[in-house]
């Protein structure tokens, strides 16, 4: 997928002033909007001469000597600065600071693109900060983050931030139709879903999981299934803990909104119109789940069964169907 296929990114790209580009750029927004595609296109513009076929081929093959792409699930300190006796299977001893300290090989510039920059700990971020405070000439660092305010404020102060635009349901649905998808639309997914994630869910046969989750909640709250059965079913989903927590938060937010605004639920949620609950209790549950999600990013060893045992117990005590 390229920039021309993602109109919301193309608009952001066209507004970038490459004649006055700072050394650091942060691309921020939820997963599934194509932030890496935008970052890659910025890097291409900085490195590739369109009249130089060799440079174009090297970049397309991800072998351009003046481009370092850190695409790791978690960015470690050794990826940012040299650590003796620490070896990376893919990068070896290559790291951001050493890479940027060398003069360009075939281009005027050197560019580092870091995906999942929000996973860096404070030590890694402080190591990176040195390259932002005293940047080498013609060097550029592009950071991709899925979470706002996940980096040190000193990093934000030395970078420009490109925030991805929020898309309306109509914009997402129109894009899906342009990709040949008309059987599904945003109403079949959580409200926070992004277009590329919808596409991936459909291609990976995961597009019915959220609907199934809501049906599970109905069975559980109406005493048609006990918590052990629900937990077993949840464990069969090929999604991570954070996604399951997001599903639960989405479900509770829909019930809460309906209650506060006195709106009648329809479709998948119509059976919850008669649900009885305290808005304060459900609000507190949502806050607790949001805090749990934040804690998980710091301590990802949280036990999934313990988490859902606790919250299903709280749900049963809070919502009557």
For each feature predicted by the language model, list its residue ranges.
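Conserved catalytic/switch belt of AAA+ P-loop NTPases
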Residues: 101, 126-143
């Amino acid at each position: 997928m390229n920039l021309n296929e993602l109109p919301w990114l193309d608009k952001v790209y066209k507004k970038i002033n490459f004649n006055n580009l700072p050394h650091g750029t942060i691309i921020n927004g939820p997963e599934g909007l194509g932030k890496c595609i935008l970052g890659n296109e910025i890097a291409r513009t900085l490195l590739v001469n369109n009249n130089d076929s060799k440079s174009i081929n090297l970049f397309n093959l991800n072998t351009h000597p003046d481009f370092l792409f850190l695409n790791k699930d978690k960015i470690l300190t050794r990826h940012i600065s040299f650590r003796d006796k620490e070896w990376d299977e893919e990068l070896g001893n290559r790291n951001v600071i050493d890479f940027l300290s060398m003069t360009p090989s075939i281009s005027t510039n050197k560019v580092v693109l870091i995906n999942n920059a929000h996973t860096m700990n404070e030590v890694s971020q402080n190591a990176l900060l040195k390259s932002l405070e005293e940047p080498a000439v013609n060097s550029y660092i592009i950071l991709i983050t899925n979470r706002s305010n996940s980096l040190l404020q000193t990093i934000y102060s030395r970078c420009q931030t490109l925030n991805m635009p929020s898309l309306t349901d109509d914009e997402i649905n129109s894009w899906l139709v342009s990709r040949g998808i008309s059987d599904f639309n945003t109403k079949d997914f959580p409200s926070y879903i992004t277009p590329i994630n919808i596409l991936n869910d459909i291609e990976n046969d995961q597009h019915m999981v959220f609907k199934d989750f809501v049906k599970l909640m109905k069975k559980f709250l109406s005493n048609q299934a006990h918590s052990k059965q629900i937990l077993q079913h949840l464990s069969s989903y090929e999604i991570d803990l954070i996604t399951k927590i997001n599903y639960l938060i989405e479900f509770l937010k829909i019930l809460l909104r309906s209650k506060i605004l006195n709106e009648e639920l329809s479709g998948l949620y119509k059976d919850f119109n008669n649900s009885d609950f305290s808005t304060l209790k459900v609000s507190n549950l949502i806050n607790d789940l949001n805090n749990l999600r934040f804690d998980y990013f710091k301590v990802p060893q949280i036990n999934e069964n313990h988490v859902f045992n606790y919250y299903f117990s709280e749900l049963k005590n809070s919502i009557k169907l």
